[in-house]
Structure formats: C-alpha cells, structure tokens
A protein has these predicted regions:
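Short catalytic/ligand-binding loop motif for oxyanion handling, primarily in non-cytosolic enzymes
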Residues: 88-92, 151-152, 190-191
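C-terminal segment of classical bacterial N-terminal signal peptides
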Residues: 22-26
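Glycine-rich anion-binding loop/nest that anchors nucleotide
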Residues: 177-193, 207-213
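N-terminal secretory signal peptides and thylakoid transit peptides that target proteins
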Residues: 1-16
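Histidine-anchored nucleotide/phosphate-binding helix
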Residues: 192-200
Length: 243
C-alpha cells in the first residue's frame, strides 16, 4: 500500500520523464537526426584542468585537443556544470604520500583499491586551474572533488566510497535535470565514474566520445566502456548534437 501518495507521484513522474528522455535519444539515433539539447539537459564538463593537459603533472594524451570541441558543444547547451579535481597537499591518492610506492601502483584502502597518482591538481596551484582556453561563461556550477585528504574522488556525484556525496545529485534533482551529457578527462576514470553515478541517481547519461580522452592504463579504457555500456550509458559523438 502506498502511504506517501505525493512522494509516489513525484517518483513516478520523474521516472516517466527520464524514460521519455532516453526514448528521445534512441529515436534520434534511429532516424539519423541530431539531438537538440533542451531545458532538462545538462552538459557536464569533467576536469579540463592544466595538470591533465600535455605538460601537466598527470597529462592525458591529446587532452588539450578536446578544448575547442568542448567550447563548441557548451555553446549549444543552456545548462553547463564543470568539475575540478581539488586535492590537498599529501593527498592519500598521491604516490608521494606512501613511502616506497610509485605512481600507478595500487594499494588497498578502506573504500577499496586505490591507484596511486603523481601529485596533481593541488589546491591553489596552477595545475589545478581550468584550462585557459576553456570558454564557458554561462557555466552554472563548479563541483570541486577530491578535497577530502583521506579519500579520493573520481565521480562528480560521489566520493570513491560510493556513498559520500559531492552535492551534485541533489543539485540536478532540485533543478529538474533529466539527462546529462559528459565530456572531459579522463574517459576511463572521472568521466566513466561520473557517467555510472549519473545512472545510479536516475539520470539518462550520454558520453560524447570525441570530446573526451582516456589514460588507458592496463586496458582501463576498454573496461570503462564495457562498464558504461552495461549500465546503460549512451556512447555518442559530437556530430550527433545539434549545436
């Protein structure tokens, strides 16, 4: 028996709207039509920061090549949210914080397996800044993640324990967004985790493949696409978007 009719109706309507959004994406692909972002769609620009660009501390190959395309796509969206890796000095994810360990080795922490990274995106440093050529003046929100010293964060929605929220899930719910399109760095880590968690909180999620770049360490890129496909994340191209 339903005791909270208002909550039940709200949940039912949200599910129906999400299903409608997903159907719209499928129909656009089936008909070869371009996807026109609407008022319930949001572009999520993930970690386009100096330390992830060639020459940075944790450079993603060709990471800078996506910047013009991200700008072009952002111009076609009414709503844009950006994320920013924002680590403390001596962060638990840094290899330098673990004597004898090297970057890209793994350790086990309370929340699971942790890849150890070179020091990167340290709060207040130039490496943590968004790329200078990123031009998104209408960006509505910047989500900073990874600022808890004892926990890493890849996802824009949750920290690495999968429970501690960044606040983004509440924000998108309050704003009434139903569908998120993801671009940025890196495909197989922060973009992937964000896309999976977008599905977890009930959003339709599409990754714009050519507006992302991956690290692909030990086959991580292929594994990420497998995970995303299994979770119902759409894999699309910038040419699919009407901008």
């Amino acid at each position: 028996m339903v005791t909270d009719r208002r909550g039940f109706l709200k949940s039912t309507m949200a599910g129906a709207l999400a299903a409608t959004a997903a159907a719209g994406v499928r129909a656009a692909h089936a008909q070869g039509a371009k996807i026109k972002p609407g008022g319930r769609d949001v572009l999520l620009v993930v970690d386009v920061q100096n330390d992830f660009i060639p020459g940075g501390a944790l450079a993603v190959k060709e990471g800078d090549a996506i910047v013009p395309l991200v700008n072009q796509l952002a111009a076609g969206f009414e709503h844009v949210i950006l994320t920013q890796d924002w680590h403390t000095p001596g962060h638990i994810s840094f290899a330098s914080a673990h004597p004898g360990k090297k970057p890209f080795e793994t350790i086990t922490l309370g929340y699971g397996t942790q890849v150890l990274w070179p020091d990167h995106c340290v709060q207040g440093t130039p490496g943590a800044d968004l790329h200078k050529d990123l031009k998104i003046p209408h960006g509505e929100l910047i989500i900073r993640k990874g600022y808890r010293k004892q926990m890493d964060s890849y996802s824009a929605f949750f920290e690495a324990d999968g429970k501690t929220t960044t606040g983004l899930s509440g924000y998108v719910k309050d704003r009434g967004f139903r569908q998120v399109y993801l671009v940025g760095l890196a495909t197989d880590f922060c973009v992937c985790w964000s896309a999976l968690d977008a599905r977890k909180v009930g959003l339709v999620a599409s990754v714009i493949e050519d507006a992302c770049r991956g690290i692909d360490t030990n086959g991580s890129l292929g594994k990420a696409w497998e995970q995303m496909t299994k979770a119902g994340v759409k894999r699309i191209r910038s040419a699919d978007i009407a901008v």
